């Protein structure tokens, strides 16, 4: 078999990482490269027992630090070859025509699409004599932006995938790579397969893995002709034929088969039935191109349902609602009743009241509607009954309104004015309520004084003082002493690193909960 190469950027100079410790300045990279390009091992997920090859070159390009490595472990390649032969998805081949079918390369690209550089911490002064670069790893996703691993059989093919690399830089990489492979010790790959399976399981549950890979692919300017499936939509319709064998259902995919559902152009549709017919025809045409195939989301038999994409469905819904005629409410024959009059039902006494009124004023009572009685809106009670305000109820006049000097809460004059406001108020209920509040406050202060005096008396009589240790939160220095920072920094994204980044947020939330609990306890003690 031919050689398997892997290439990609270990860091991008123009992008800032999410964590400050992951920053890798260009001057630092150039300084370390001038000191001597030491051969670095290539492993899996920073596991030194899972070394699969060697790094053949590190190059300082305009876009970032580029790496070219070779996979030399035959034991590891045998595992990849067996996995690729049993995978139905890989056996179906790539949907992109320019890519040649290569199950091993596709399996490597799907399992380890990220690159990670293990380097020395910049702030650590204890590792001055040791090399800055430690090793390079292939992983599920890298922590630094733009760290995508491209696997291939030739270095030139890998370099052509990156549009951000110029032609002169490609020649520089091809001339600087050490293509002469040296002997590889197979004992370097001694990792347990269960450990690799556990790492793969942990990586699959990283929530931001696929969005991170999509962003990295855009930062590196990778073309669509790659085996990495990070840029493909997360939900894909796989056309397969189901063959039932016993209690198991075997799905056999057909290479090159695709289910293309086209969305109808709603802008040229002038009727609801035309839109539905066009969408139905599009679906029928797409199904005719797939002989002897049954999609996973096929419609049940004897059904009149039409399966449409979400965008087409909402477009049809908008067209349907937009073409409905606007309903105008009918105009009332009678004019609306104003708020000044209240219409009462007809009663027999209405005629008698009209007759009495006409006899009283010696004139006939003329009514516009003799069968209806109108009553005016009740007026304000004070005006209706001739109510007069008492002399004691006057407009409040405070001495502070006429004074030019300002006072603020806490000043003696301010408290006097507030008391004067309360004295001028003649509401007995308000005064009684304030007196009760003051009396309760005085009683509570008296109880607190009694408790303090009792505690002082007990402490004075006790010959020995017992000290109870209290649990306190560790300081930043104590945290640093208890958990020292690692001297080697691994730039692969794992669930452990994600939880570590969230630890600071959890500590601040715990402190906030503690303060809230103390405040609630104090309020409960005052209420009791």
UniProtKB/Swiss-Prot annotation:
A motif (Nuclear localization signal) lies at residues 416-422. One of its GO terms (molecular function) is identical protein binding. Residues 270-288 are annotated as: Interaction with pAP. SUPFAM superfamilies: Herpes virus serine proteinase, assemblin. Pfam families: Peptidase_S21 (PF00716). Keywords: Host cytoplasm, Host nucleus, Hydrolase, Phosphoprotein, Protease, Serine protease, Viral capsid assembly, Viral release from host cell. Transmembrane segments: none annotated. GO terms for biological process: nuclear capsid assembly; proteolysis; viral release from host cell. GO terms for cellular component: host cell cytoplasm; host cell nucleus. Region of interaction between pPR and pAP is called Amino conserved domain (ACD). The region of interaction with major capsid protein is called carboxyl conserved domain (CCD). This is Capsid scaffolding protein. The gene is U53.
């Amino acid at each position: 078999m031919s050689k398997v190469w892997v290439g990609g950027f270990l860091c991008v100079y123009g992008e800032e990482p999410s964590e400050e410790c992951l920053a890798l300045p260009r001057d630092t990279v150039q300084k370390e490269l001038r000191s001597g390009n030491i051969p670095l091992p290539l492993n899996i997920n920073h596991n030194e027992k899972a070394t699969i090859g060697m790094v053949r070159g590190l190059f300082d390009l305009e876009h970032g630090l580029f790496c070219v490595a070779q996979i030399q472990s035959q034991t590891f390649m045998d595992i990849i070859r067996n996995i690729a032969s049993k995978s139905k998805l890989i056996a179906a081949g790539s949907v992109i025509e320019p890519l040649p079918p290569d199950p091993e390369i596709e399996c490597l690209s799907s399992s380890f699409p990220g690159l990670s550089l293990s380097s020395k911490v910049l702030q650590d002064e204890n590792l001055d004599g040791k090399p800055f670069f430690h090793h390079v790893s292939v992983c599920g996703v890298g922590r630094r932006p733009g760290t995508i691993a491209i696997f291939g059989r030739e270095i030139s093919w890998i370099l052509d995938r990156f549009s951000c690399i110029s032609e002169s830089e490609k020649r520089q990489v091809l001339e600087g790579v050490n293509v002469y492979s040296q002997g590889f010790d197979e004992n370097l790959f001694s990792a347990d397969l269960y450990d690799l399976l556990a790492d793969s399981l942990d990586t699959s549950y990283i929530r931001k893995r696929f969005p991170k890979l999509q962003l990295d692919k855009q930062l590196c300017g990778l073309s669509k002709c790659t085996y990495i499936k990070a840029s493909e939509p997360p939900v894909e319709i796989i056309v397969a034929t189901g063959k039932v064998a016993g209690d198991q259902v075997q799905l056999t995919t057909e290479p090159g088969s695709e289910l293309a559902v086209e969305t109808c152009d709603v802008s040229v549709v002038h009727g609801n039935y035309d839109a539905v017919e066009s969408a139905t025809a599009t679906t029928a045409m797409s199904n005719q191109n797939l002989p002897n195939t049954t999609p996973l989301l096929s419609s049940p038999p004897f059904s009149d349902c039409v399966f449409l994409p979400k965008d087409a469905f909402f477009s049809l819904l908008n067209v349907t609602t937009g073409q409905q005629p606007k309903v105008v409410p009918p105009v009332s024959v009678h004019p609306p009743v104003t708020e000044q009059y209240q219409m009462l039902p007809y009663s027999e006494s209405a005629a008698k009241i009209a007759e009495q009124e006409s006899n009283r004023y010696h004139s006939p009572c003329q009514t516009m509607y003799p069968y209806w009685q109108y009553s005016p809106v009740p007026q304000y009670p004070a005006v209706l009954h001739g109510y007069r305000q008492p002399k004691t109820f006057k407009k409040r006049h405070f001495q502070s309104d006429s004074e030019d000097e300002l006072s603020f809460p806490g000043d003696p004059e301010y408290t006097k004015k507030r008391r004067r406001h309360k004295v001028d108020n003649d509401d007995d209920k308000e005064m009684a309520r304030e007196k009760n509040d003051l009396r309760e406050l005085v009683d509570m202060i008296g109880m607190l004084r009694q408790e303090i005096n009792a505690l002082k008396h007990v402490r004075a009589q006790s010959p020995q003082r017992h000290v109870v240790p209290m649990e306190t939160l560790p300081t930043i220095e104590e945290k640093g002493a208890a958990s020292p920072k690692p001297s080697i920094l691994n730039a692969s994204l794992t669930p452990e690193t994600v939880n570590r980044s969230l630890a600071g947020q959890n500590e601040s939330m715990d402190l906030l909960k503690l303060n809230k609990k103390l405040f609630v306890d104090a309020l409960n003690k005052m209420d009791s």
